[in-house]
């Protein structure tokens, strides 16, 4: 028989130790966490980013904003920035969809381009080498609330019958009236109207990751160096001169549009919760009531949030942050919890459970001015892409 002192040991331990040393009982039952003030968390994240950017650029304070020259960036600087951003985007290619998420039906939505009577088209009406198609990102966001929900996006436009063969190109609108090349196509003569389709999934995801506004595409004639014919000979339904009467109504209804295929939010929440059982650290929060560790979206507008005008590009970015509790379960596969409990007894300032921290981070290219000289820099580890419990 063991000594009586050992038999009485459990009775001498304080109540918390009895709970910690009782197998099968989750430590989460002891939680006394208060409700999180999300606005306070966001403000602290914004202030942390302010210091982070200045520190990475080795600046004690923001450059004088009165020295920033007006007008667009020099073409060489803009080209360098665009190529840097494209390289970063290429390195962070979208992951393959999970089989379970890919199994379920996608909701299909059509988002029409902004009506041609909108003033945004005024500067483009007399241009003969291109046609322009603008979209309101708030309309896109109504159909797809979160970027991860988007499965596919296509730009659809209907061309009228044509007797001309022409090489055409598609561009994505960037700021400062610059355009990013997306692809090209050879259009052959046709006796009937024909629908053209372009995969723009990556572009629409970028728009969803930015603030609301007007974004667009340019559909242009290919300009070869040895050709003087730089006129687009393709007529597009909804953009070319309107027909009268009923034909005009049909013409307007068939104007270019985005065809969006996305997982409905309520279905995504179900898939998201099931994925948590397998991988807690690779998901965005699909609602404000998310209960576990995940990526919370946070868009930083340099002017509105930081009061900065000296960063010329981009105007802002999705910094994001990690938030949410991490499971602290007593089970056969988490016996290290015993060690953590003992560690905490001797280190009261240490965390009593795993913390929700960034796992994957991406860089942010920026263009800023030092005096009147523009500089292109890439700031490392600025965008939170996934979180983990650690």
UniProtKB/Swiss-Prot annotation:
The record marks 278-279 as: Cleavage. Abundant in the bone matrix. Expressed in cardiomyocytes. Keywords: Cleavage on pair of basic residues, Disulfide bond, Extracellular matrix, Glycoprotein, Growth factor, Mitogen, Secreted, Signal. Transforming growth factor beta-1 proprotein: The precursor proprotein is cleaved in the Golgi apparatus by FURIN to form Transforming growth factor beta-1 (TGF-beta-1) and Latency-associated peptide (LAP) chains, which remain non-covalently linked, rendering TGF-beta-1 inactive. SUPFAM superfamilies: Cystine-knot cytokines. GO terms for cellular component: axon; blood microparticle; cell surface; cytoplasm; extracellular matrix; extracellular space; microvillus; neuronal cell body. Residues 226-252 are annotated as: Bowtie tail. Glycans are attached at residues 82, 136, 176. Transmembrane segments: none annotated. Residues 1-29 form the signal peptide. Residues 75-271 are annotated as: Arm domain. The keyword Magnesium does not apply. Transforming growth factor beta-1 proprotein: Precursor of the Latency-associated peptide (LAP) and Transforming growth factor beta-1 (TGF-beta-1) chains, which constitute the regulatory and active subunit of TGF-beta-1, respectively. Homodimer; disulfide-linked. Interacts with the serine proteases, HTRA1 and HTRA3: the interaction with either inhibits TGFB1-mediated signaling and the HTRA protease activity is required for this inhibition. May interact with THSD4; this interaction may lead to sequestration by FBN1 microfibril assembly and attenuation of TGFB signaling. Interacts with CD109, DPT and ASPN. Interacts with EFEMP2. Interacts with TSKU; the interaction contributes to regulation of the hair cycle. Interacts with TGFBR3. This is Transforming growth factor beta-1 proprotein. It comes from Rattus norvegicus. The lineage of its organism: Eukaryota, Metazoa, Chordata, Craniata, Vertebrata.
């Amino acid at each position: 028989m063991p000594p009586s002192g050992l038999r009485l040991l459990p009775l001498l331990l304080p109540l918390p130790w009895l709970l910690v040393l009782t197998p099968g009982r989750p430590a989460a039952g002891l939680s006394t966490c208060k409700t999180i003030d999300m606005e306070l968390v966001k403000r602290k994240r914004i202030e942390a980013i302010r210091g982070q950017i200045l520190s990475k650029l080795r600046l004690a304070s923001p450059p004088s904003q009165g020295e920033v020259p007006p007008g667009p960036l020099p073409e060489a600087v803009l080209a360098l920035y665009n190529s840097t951003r494209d390289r970063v985007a290429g390195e962070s290619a979208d992951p393959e969809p999970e089989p379970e998420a890919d199994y379920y039906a996608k909701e299909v939505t059509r988002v029409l381009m902004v009506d041609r009577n909108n003033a945004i088209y005024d500067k483009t009406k007399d241009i003969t080498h291109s046609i322009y198609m603008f979209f309101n990102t708030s309309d896109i966001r109504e159909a797809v609330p979160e970027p991860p929900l988007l499965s596919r996006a296509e730009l659809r436009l209907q061309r009228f019958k044509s007797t001309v063969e022409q090489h055409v190109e598609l561009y994505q609108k960037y700021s400062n009236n610059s355009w990013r090349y997306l692809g090209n196509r050879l259009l052959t003569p046709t006796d009937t109207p024909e629908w053209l389709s372009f995969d723009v999934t990556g572009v629409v995801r970028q728009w969803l990751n930015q603030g609301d506004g007007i974004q667009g595409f340019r559909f242009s004639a290919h300009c070869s160096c040895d050709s003087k014919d730089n006129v687009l000979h393709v007529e597009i339904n909804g953009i070319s001169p309107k027909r009268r009467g009923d034909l005009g109504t049909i013409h307007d209804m068939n104007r270019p549009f985005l065809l969006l295929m996305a997982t409905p939010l309520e279905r995504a929440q179900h898939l998201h919760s099931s994925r948590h059982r397998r991988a807690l650290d690779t998901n965005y929060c699909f609602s404000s009531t998310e209960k576990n560790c995940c990526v919370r979206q946070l868009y930083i507008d340099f002017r509105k949030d930081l009061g900065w005008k000296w960063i010329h590009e981009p105007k802002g970015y999705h910094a994001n942050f990690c938030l949410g509790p991490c499971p602290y379960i007593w089970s056969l596969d988490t016996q290290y919890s015993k060690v953590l409990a003992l560690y905490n007894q001797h280190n009261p300032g240490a965390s009593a459970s795993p913390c929700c921290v960034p796992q994957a981070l991406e860089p942010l290219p920026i263009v800023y001015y030092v005096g009147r000289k523009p500089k292109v820099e890439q700031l490392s580890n600025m965008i939170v892409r996934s979180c983990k419990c650690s």
